[in-house]
Amino acid sequence: MDPIISAASVIAAGLAVGLAAIGPGIGQGSAAANAVEGLARQPEAEGKIRGTLLLSLAFMESLTIYGLVVALSLLFANPFIK
């Protein structure tokens, strides 16, 4: 096993998880803030806002999980190591 390839794989795995968490983290914070603002303006639309918020948060969180899958495949099932 080449040490340069394994070191690059560890760095890439760390970057994959870190970068995959930044975008959804910012998006989830923004979505939650806008949902709270919408609830403050129209409390009667709580059910519709909550359902849409939970669905969008699940989609955003799936991006982070995909980054984790890429990182785990680089660490444990690396296609670049023969």
UniProtKB/Swiss-Prot annotation:
Its main location: plastid. The keyword Protein biosynthesis does not apply. It is a multi-pass membrane protein. GO terms for cellular component: chloroplast thylakoid membrane; proton-transporting ATP synthase complex; proton-transporting two-sector ATPase complex, proton-transporting domain. HAMAP family: ATP_synth_c_bact (MF_01396). Belongs to the ATPase C chain family. This is ATP synthase subunit c, chloroplastic.
